[in-house]
Amino acid sequence: MAATPDREKALEAALAQIDKQFGKGSIMRLGDDTRAPIEVIPTGSIALDVALGIGGLPRGRVVEIYGPESSGKTTVALHAVANAQRAGGIAAFIDAEHALDPDYAAKLGVDTDALLVSQPDTGEQALEIMDMLVGSGSLDIVVIDSVAALVPRAEIEGEMGDSHVGLQARLMSQALRKITGRLSQTKTTAIFINQLREKIGVFFGSPETTTGGKALKFYASVRIDVRRIQTLKEGADSVGNRTKAKIVKNKMAPPFKIAEFDIIYGQGISREGGIIDMGVEHGIIKKSGSWFTYDGDQLGQGMENSRRFLRDNPELAQELERLIKEKLGVGVVKTEEDSPKLKAVDG
């Protein structure tokens, strides 16, 4: 039905009133193209950034990272914190598990002096602190580690063995209803780290489930399943893990993409290893035998030497990362100058 001039005039008056009362941009036509591009925080793994489809974790959204114990969940979150801080952002870490290692966080690039840390006594306290920080409008990223450790006050104050069915799920549901809108308004990324549990009596399908009820599954714009798939060795020594991350939910881009990357003990995600893997996969870096070359110059013999070479030459690593993202059309970051060609590391 065609809009008459009177109806059009009435609509424009209503839109003007909405903008005046609730702020400009409260309502708009989808075709106006006034939506800002999605801002992201890089994860530290180029493979994971590409799998997310937008170049990193979205600003102003809820992100859930879950998986088995020691799979790399906190490592991924801390890398995102470090990247947010490098961009001049303010980060908070709500350590409900009381297990944050400041030395390890510093090795991953986190500015521990500037990091806001809270070790709350109850789940209510943790989520209230988070709400107040987000409401300040000054925060860029907040991490909650972990949902399983957000124990309701009634459970802590009660007797051992008391039943508190659904208490944590109700707490999470109430908190997320309140916080989600504020996250969007303040462009704050909230990362909830979660643990896995097994449902009893499941014979078909996966018995695995996450803690905290269903609210987080609904409110999360991105859900990442992180698993350790292989132990990395140098000789007889274990030096790290090969990690697989599956994007099981993504409201920003197509879901179900898979990324693989290396986590080195004491160092975190190997950014350089990810660049080499993705570079070879997409034909930017050539592999001949055990040698890796870029643009006719040898990077090194073997993965470890090539990784060390890129670590020693960050300009080249940045150029390769830019070329890979440019080729895939994801999170392109332009640089003014190409890096010089450099001498390779022999193995």
Curated annotation (Swiss-Prot):
<keyword id="KW-0963">Cytoplasm</keyword>
<dbReference type="InterPro" id="IPR049261">
    <property type="entry name" value="RecA-like_C"/>
</dbReference>
<dbReference type="GO" id="GO:0003684">
    <property type="term" value="F:damaged DNA binding"/>
</dbReference>
<dbReference type="Pfam" id="PF21096">
    <property type="entry name" value="RecA_C"/>
</dbReference>
<dbReference type="GO" id="GO:0005829">
    <property type="term" value="C:cytosol"/>
</dbReference>
<dbReference type="InterPro" id="IPR027417">
    <property type="entry name" value="P-loop_NTPase"/>
</dbReference>
<protein>
    <recommendedName>
        <fullName>Protein RecA</fullName>
    </recommendedName>
</protein>
<dbReference type="Pfam" id="PF00154">
    <property type="entry name" value="RecA"/>
</dbReference>
<dbReference type="InterPro" id="IPR020587">
    <property type="entry name" value="RecA_monomer-monomer_interface"/>
</dbReference>
<dbReference type="GO" id="GO:0140664">
    <property type="term" value="F:ATP-dependent DNA damage sensor activity"/>
</dbReference>
<keyword id="KW-0742">SOS response</keyword>
<keyword id="KW-0227">DNA damage</keyword>
<keyword id="KW-0067">ATP-binding</keyword>
<keyword id="KW-0233">DNA recombination</keyword>
<comment type="function">
    <text>Can catalyze the hydrolysis of ATP in the presence of single-stranded DNA, the ATP-dependent uptake of single-stranded DNA by duplex DNA, and the ATP-dependent hybridization of homologous single-stranded DNAs. It interacts with LexA causing its activation and leading to its autocatalytic cleavage.</text>
</comment>
<keyword id="KW-0234">DNA repair</keyword>
<keyword id="KW-0238">DNA-binding</keyword>
<dbReference type="InterPro" id="IPR003593">
    <property type="entry name" value="AAA+_ATPase"/>
</dbReference>
<dbReference type="InterPro" id="IPR020584">
    <property type="entry name" value="DNA_recomb/repair_RecA_CS"/>
</dbReference>
<dbReference type="GO" id="GO:0003697">
    <property type="term" value="F:single-stranded DNA binding"/>
</dbReference>
<dbReference type="GO" id="GO:0009432">
    <property type="term" value="P:SOS response"/>
</dbReference>
<dbReference type="InterPro" id="IPR013765">
    <property type="entry name" value="DNA_recomb/repair_RecA"/>
</dbReference>
<dbReference type="GO" id="GO:0016887">
    <property type="term" value="F:ATP hydrolysis activity"/>
</dbReference>
<dbReference type="GO" id="GO:0005524">
    <property type="term" value="F:ATP binding"/>
</dbReference>
<keyword id="KW-0547">Nucleotide-binding</keyword>
<dbReference type="InterPro" id="IPR023400">
    <property type="entry name" value="RecA_C_sf"/>
</dbReference>
<dbReference type="GO" id="GO:0006310">
    <property type="term" value="P:DNA recombination"/>
</dbReference>
<comment type="similarity">
    <text>Belongs to the RecA family.</text>
</comment>
<feature type="binding site">
    <location>
        <begin position="67"/>
        <end position="74"/>
    </location>
    <ligand>
        <name>ATP</name>
    </ligand>
</feature>
<dbReference type="InterPro" id="IPR020588">
    <property type="entry name" value="RecA_ATP-bd"/>
</dbReference>
<dbReference type="GO" id="GO:0006281">
    <property type="term" value="P:DNA repair"/>
</dbReference>
<dbReference type="InterPro" id="IPR049428">
    <property type="entry name" value="RecA-like_N"/>
</dbReference>
